[in-house]
């Protein structure tokens, strides 16, 4: 199976040599209000996001009321919800009749529009508007939806939270059987926002993905607080970064508490851009901004005392001291300089140059 090492999303090229592409997952943080959804698009753009992403689901097509009743109690991040799982999904879904308004707002804000669809109809309804399709971690084993997304002719972003390598391999095969355009995303699906989650985010999985699928475009869907994990992921090769986004972490709702806000999002983007600049290209060289320090920090061979022209140099005539002018003999040249005669007289402290030697 083959995959593309470069992928286009909207107007951006996603590749190892390109800046990371930031997806602000607004998800349920519109709180069921179109006006809030549109405002969050603008706030995400202003904070430096490349994409505003939503989630399209209908409660009856994603969760089973009796199934959750059988569990006896809501667990994981759902344990803090004040309503049943079905009620929460029903309250916070993104209405499909909002689509054109959301797309138009994204166009006005000059930010890409994207969604995570959770059923076949949602995917079909959104395809005309999105540059790529995100598959959430929970659907990594939902082959029909994965296959449908892969066959749509647009890049697939595949999240891999709460999955083992066998799960990932299977889902990747489903995509690559139909498309070469895949972004494989490491993810941890604990949404508590606890700092303890740093112990489980396992960024080195990105290295495992890179070894298993060399050249594949990698990404990171993050739910940890702050942006430390994002910086680590970017350093390990993630070129697509997704985090939840809100305008107010204190608002009531399933996703506000662990989301980034405009201030922290901007800080994350700026820190990542600094990191990307710092990573460089891996070629070891004297950098342009080191030219002056090279002179003042390196040592040159210098005369310990005044010597006349014709003097045959001995090791005790020379010492290695800063600075080292560009044409001076550095300490590595001591063996080659000893025993040579001077063409001209040299004063105490003068730097020795190869042109001084006969």
Give the residues covered by each predicted segment:
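Catalytic cores and adjacent flexible loops of soluble metabolic enzymes
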Residues: 1-358
